[in-house]
């Protein structure tokens, strides 16, 4: 009887130790995010913005990876893009061109604080130079990209980074390709930022 109790205790301790070990997908995701951090892509796990289709193809549902590249001495327009058919398309809820074709009405949620005196804030139309631009990202990243945001001196890409490391969604995953794929992503973010400055 004492041996039986000893075996149960040992199995319980071993089971507890096995439960503490992170699974393979979590380890891969950690490696991806640490590499992105080293490349100054500033990864974060955020709730899906309400203008992006997230979990179950519903707007604002689920969690996404947010990778932000901060560019020194750069001023980018405040724009949002969604991926439609492998191309960047401006977020239709962000644009209101119904009043005037050359002016853009900024929704009240993103008006600056200095516009408190003016109730109908109107600015020049935002630069949509990335409209219909192809993604041109690695095949292991491109299917998981959801949106792009530019503001001030940063360009942010939203994508399902966990799908990149999950064997069911990316069977061609190889750990040695993480850095190369992220370097291509960083280069594309820099290219898109320079196109928006023209």
Please give the residue ranges for each predicted region.
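Short extracytoplasmic
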Residues: 41-58
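Structured extramembrane domains adjacent to transmembrane segments
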Residues: 60-191, 195
């Amino acid at each position: 009887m004492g041996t039986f109790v000893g075996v149960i205790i040992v199995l319980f301790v071993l089971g507890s130790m096995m439960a503490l070990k992170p699974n393979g997908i979590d380890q891969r995701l950690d490696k991806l995010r640490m590499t992105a951090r080293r490349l100054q892509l500033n990864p974060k796990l955020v709730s899906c913005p309400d203008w992006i289709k997230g979990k179950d193809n519903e707007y604002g549902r689920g969690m996404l990876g947010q990778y932000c590249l901060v560019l020194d001495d750069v001023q980018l327009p405040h724009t949002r893009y969604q991926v439609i058919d492998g191309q960047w398309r401006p977020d239709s809820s962000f644009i209101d061109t119904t009043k005037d074709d050359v002016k853009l009405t900024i929704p009240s949620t993103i008006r600056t604080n200095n516009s408190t005196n003016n109730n109908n804030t109107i600015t020049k139309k935002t630069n949509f130079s990335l409209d219909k631009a192809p993604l041109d990202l690695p095949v292991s990243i491109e299917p998981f990209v959801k949106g792009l945001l530019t503001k001030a001196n940063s360009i942010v890409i939203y994508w399902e980074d966990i799908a990149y490391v999950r064997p069911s969604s990316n069977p061609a995953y190889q750990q040695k390709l993480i850095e190369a794929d992220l370097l291509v992503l960083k280069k594309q973010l820099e290219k898109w930022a320079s196109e928006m400055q023209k």
